[in-house]
Amino acid sequence: NTGAMAALQSLNQTNKGLAQVQSRINTGLNVASTKDDSASFTIAQSLRGDVGGLSAVNSSLNRGKSTVDVAIAGAEQISDVLNQMKAKAIQASDDGLDAESRTAINADYTALKEQITTIIASSEFNGTNLLKDDATSTGKVSALQSLDTTSTIGVANQAFETNVTTALGTGLGSKADADTALTEIDTVTATVTSTLSTLGSASRKIEGQLSFNSKLSDVIESGIGNLVDADLAKESAKLQALQVKQQLGVQALS
């Protein structure tokens, strides 16, 4: 009869609505596919692509920062060794030293120079050594800065094998040699100090970009949520109402 048909149609509509609400609660999404809202779904998908892109950019920046930070650690250690070398050179500048003492001081000085060589060789991360390689060679840091892949943060190689190791060429075999070594140490110390300033600035710049990208990603994620997320409190209330309606519909049919 007509009443039964109307009750059946109403129950079918209730069941359909119930299925939609349950799907929104289960997925947490009001717009789960383009069938729900093509405009919102398309925009959300594009924004999800941006979030994924920012994640890749941040991976590049993190690799760059780690490379720079390893170089900073190496340069700081070299700075400490240079201070020890300067103390040895000052000792050796004493013209009254006996031969045995000068030989011992020179041996210590040579060992410190070798330590610098080891530090330079060890200051590598992920195959890149900013201290060892010369300024024109490959391997320098070039990290993606943003979704615009042509925008990068670059950090040049510092050529310490030439600017530090080779520059410390004089030993402490005589007072004259010690005086020359002191001049070399002062020159190299200035180079290392300048390098630390350059690398520190680069590390802070990368860190700042990482922070900005993280905030940008959070804002985009929030925007995606505004477009497609379900209001779970509202949907839960709908679910309860539809369940009651469904029960009444079943009773009406019976």
Roles of regions detected by a PLM:
Residues 1-254:
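Primary detection of the long, small/polar-rich alpha-helical "axial" segments characteristic
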